[in-house]
Amino acid sequence: LEVPELLAAPCPVVRFNAIVAGKYKLRILWELRAGAKRYSEIGRALQDATGGQPITPRVLSRELKELTVNELISRKQFPGVPPRVEYKLTPSGRALSGVLRAICRWGGPASV
């Protein structure tokens, strides 16, 4: 099934998985729980979380775009040179905070 079909699925678990499936999406949501972050800050946080393995700009951009399209995060561009972009959780994204905390508890203290 394609993602649009999965988003229309009657099962909420299938819909949730269609929205957050991806190598970094849950981690991005976790990083944004404390407030807005710039693109580069998110990239560094993900690199730190993966033991120094860098995330490619293409992959990070794709994950951020998909989270934005699914309205879990918002993107705000500020005028100026160089352009500055910040991402933050939307109300829908903030609603996942409890789920993310439960995942961290399940994963144990080393996961936080």
Annotate each language-model stretch with its function.
Residues 11-59:
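N-terminal helix-turn-helix DNA-binding core of bacterial DNA-binding proteins
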Residues 70, 99-111:
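Alpha-helical linker/hinge and terminal dimerization helices associated
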Residues 15, 43-45, 69, 86, ...:
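Non-catalytic interaction surface on structured domains
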Residues 79-100:
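Basic, amphipathic "hinge/linker" alpha-helix immediately C-terminal to the N-terminal HTH DNA-binding motif
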Residues 47-82:
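Canonical helix-turn-helix DNA-binding module
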Residues 1-12:
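Long, low-complexity, charged/polar intrinsically disordered regions in eukaryotic proteins
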